[in-house]
């Protein structure tokens, strides 16, 4: 069995977990999440704990660890939630919230509007910062990657959209 899958997922107070064949639903104070679990993994809910184990074979042991990590992210998401911070670095690079989307000015001839999917909210503490919040870790990471993809940080001046905890490796300019 996977080392990750050996540890059970604790169910905190106020969280309700329902298991219907291979579909698991987790409901909490911040909302509810549903996910289909791989058929090679057996999931058992007992004594305020969720236990994952592989059905048989070595190749399915990795799937049990993945399922346990995904279920843990669901439990954390509906209780505490997740957030991802983006920074806009560059002259004239700005962001503002416009309805159900983020209005981005990133040095193009036109402003970009990135529509946010359901389950993700954004706020701009300053013009050069975006904070994405929600319950689904995968969805927040996907939206952050899409916004970063409009203008990824370049290695010479460091301009672009980057994650708050990202280190951009700088290059030296070509010399004559």
Curated annotation (Swiss-Prot):
GO MF annotation list: rRNA binding; structural constituent of ribosome
The protein's assembly and partners: Part of the 50S ribosomal subunit.
Biological processes per GO annotation: cytoplasmic translation
Region annotation (Disordered) ranges: 151-176
Keywords, in A-Z order: Ribonucleoprotein, Ribosomal protein, RNA-binding, rRNA-binding
Gene3D superfamilies xrefs: Ribosomal protein L6, alpha-beta domain (3.90.930.12)
Record-linked Pfam families: Ribosomal_L6
Family classification: Belongs to the universal ribosomal protein uL6 family.
Gene encoding the protein: rplF
The protein, known as: Large ribosomal subunit protein uL6
Ranges annotated as biased composition (Basic and acidic residues): 151-170
Superkingdom classification of source: Bacteria
Xref: InterPro entries: Ribosomal_uL6-like (IPR000702), Ribosomal_uL6-like_a/b-dom_sf (IPR036789), Ribosomal_uL6_a/b-dom (IPR020040), Ribosomal_uL6_bac-type (IPR019906), Ribosomal_uL6_CS (IPR002358)
HAMAP family linked: Ribosomal_uL6_B
Function: This protein binds to the 23S rRNA, and is important in its secondary structure. It is located near the subunit interface in the base of the L7/L12 stalk, and near the tRNA binding site of the peptidyltransferase center.
GO cellular component: a single term: cytosolic large ribosomal subunit
PROSITE patterns: RIBOSOMAL_L6_1
Native organism: Shewanella piezotolerans (strain WP3 / JCM 13877)
């Amino acid at each position: 069995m996977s080392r990750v899958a050996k540890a059970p997922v604790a169910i905190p107070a106020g969280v309700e977990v329902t298991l219907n064949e291979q579909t698991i639903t987790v409901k909490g104070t911040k909302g509810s999440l549903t996910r289909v679990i791989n058929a090679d993994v057996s999931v058992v809910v007992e004594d305020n704990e969720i236990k994952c184990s592989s059905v048989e074979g070595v190749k399915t042991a990795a799937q049990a660890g993945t399922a346990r990590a995904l279920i843990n992210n669901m439990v954390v998401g509906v209780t505490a939630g997740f957030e991802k911070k983006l920074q806009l670095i560059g002259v004239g690079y700005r962001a503002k919230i416009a309805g159900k989307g983020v209005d981005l000015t990133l040095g193009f001839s036109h402003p970009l509007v990135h529509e946010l999917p359901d389950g993700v909210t954004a706020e701009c503490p300053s013009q050069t910062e975006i904070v994405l919040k929600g319950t689904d870790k995968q969805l927040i990471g996907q939206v952050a990657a899409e916004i970063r993809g409009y203008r990824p940080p370049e290695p010479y001046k460091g301009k672009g959209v980057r994650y708050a905890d990202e280190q951009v490796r700088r290059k030296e300019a070509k010399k004559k």
